[in-house]
Amino acid sequence: MTKIYASEQRFWGENDSQTIQNAVNYAEETGLGEVIIPRFNDRTGKALWDLPEAVLLPSDMTIILDGCHLRHADDSHDNLFRNRNMWTDLGKTMEGEQHDIRIIGHGNAWIDGGKHNGVFEQTHRDHPGKYRGMIWQIPLNFSNVRNMEIRGIKFFETRYWALCFHYCRWVLLSDLHFENSGLYENQDGIDLRCGCEYFTIQNITGWTGDDVVALTAMAWGNSAALKVEGKTWDTHDITIKNIIASSHGCGIIRFLVEGGAREYNLTVDGIKDITQSVSGTALLIGTSDNHFADPPHQMTDFKNVVIRNVTTCSQRAISIGETCRDVLIENVTTYGPNQVAVRFYDNFECENLTIRNLTCRSQKGCLDSVFWMGKNPERRLKHFKVENVLVASTDYVFRCTEFPVDNLIVEEINKGWFIDEKIKLPSAYGRYHYMAYGKILDDCRPKDNRYDGTLKTPAELAAE
């Protein structure tokens, strides 16, 4: 098979984006359908590809990143890759659904955010309509595509989320590594928005500034602007497994539904916190933010969910602020500086939710409470069950609300069984930002990646 290399002189354009686009266009015209981007860029004589604008991908196209380093060009404000029909009228129809797009990394393939262009979410609030939206800062951005595969790529200090999907189906995301240090707001890893279905997300490593993997189906904003006629708002049938990562103050796995969109048929198997940073929570279902409180959620908005095999030292192991049905969470172990094992927010309601096999071995003196359930006298709890819980040491077992737990073993209680008051936990989020709200922050980082720069990691404790 004839191989097409983007570095060939016949494809050279005014910049690296045009060069790669020329190679992609030729691969489409000839039916070869594959472009290799090598490490060395013959046009510039450097082992670097600077992309000032997005490369638009047609259907039946494979991009091989052969150990190359792709970077957002200075002052650019565009994606690196997106599908050709995105943001077109055709792309909002079933007839315009693209298919069979692959981006495969070989060797040490990197995608780099480069020098930030200074456009943040706050910038849009301060200057509405002046700049393109934040979705244009995302390196890999796709809408209305089926049969996709992205794997074998490392992401370094992306300007916003690293990957984003709307209305895509039958997608494999595998062997992706993130090194986002929380320098900027919303440095998520993978974001699935409305209309995503039949995804497998696996073997994800590294650390992110915000959520590592987020399923946020919100029926407004870009999800509304990209709405595909004939597809629903719902995100469903998603499998997430073997996530070995941490977040700077946010969730390792995050679920959120708003505006009438739903999420269902979800499986998560294997979350391991790497302690590179302080994750706010290993698992966040819903939110406690009043901004998302209207309209009230239904039990069927978040349903048919299985989450198992979670090992974490995050501030809160599990956080639930959602109305949900038919949910199973099992085999959760906490260690290190974990402060709350399970946090139920005031808006938590459920029908058939079970949490079982919870082991709390947090660093001595760190675990404030095993269960913290906000007060809500009108809360609907039907078939709510917690069982098989072992706690090595905690200040309190219950905070704010007590409820039945089957087979609960607590080896050491430092202060009391129950306390009827809220506390404010310190937050790691935002303390790591080099820039936030469009401004440079000075001396904002703690001396290490824990809450106050003094807590020791499990490895440090084991070495003593």
What are these regions (language model features)?
Residues 1-464:
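Extracellular/periplasmic carbohydrate-active domains that bind, remodel
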